[in-house]
């Protein structure tokens, strides 16, 4: 994998509106990994992509009404079968870590790359974890 203009080449890039400038775009020192599925434990759909693009169809699930006003994104989303989708260029601040603190430094979004794995906390991630190593080597 190669990065050009803060985007991984040869993967899908869907630009989320949910990002802004980093205080220092050269200070990226943390990778934050989360899991997500919408609805929970429901995989292989486009609900997460729609959520990050502010296009979630709230008629699909009652839970979607509760989260429809949230504005979130991640830099990368790795689906269960290994597909990697980028939503925010790496030099920009994705909105993935919320109110956060890492080793005494607050606002992790300022200095981190956010990666979402399609899944739940208690699921197996074999393929996703294999593909997780690819962008970290780029």
PLM regions with names:
Residues 2-23, 30, 35-129:
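Active-site-adjacent loop/helix surface patches within enzyme catalytic domains
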Residues 130-136:
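Conserved small/polar residues in nucleotide/adenosyl-binding loops
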């Amino acid at each position: 994998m190669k990065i050009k203009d803060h985007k991984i080449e040869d993967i899908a890039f869907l630009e989320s509106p949910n990002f802004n400038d980093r205080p220092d775009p050269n200070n990226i020192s943390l990778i934050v990994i989360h899991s997500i599925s919408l609805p929970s434990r429901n995989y292989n759909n486009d609900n997460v992509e729609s959520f990050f693009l502010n296009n979630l169809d709230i008629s699909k699930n009652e839970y979607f009404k509760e989260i429809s006003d949230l504005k979130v994104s991640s830099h990368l989303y790795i689906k269960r079968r290994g597909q990697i989708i980028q939503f925010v260029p790496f030099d920009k601040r994705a909105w993935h870590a919320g109110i956060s603190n890492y080793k005494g430094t607050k606002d992790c979004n300022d200095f981190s790359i956010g990666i979402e794995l399609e899944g739940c906390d208690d699921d197996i991630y074999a393929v996703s974890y294999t593909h997780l190593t690819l962008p970290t080597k780029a």
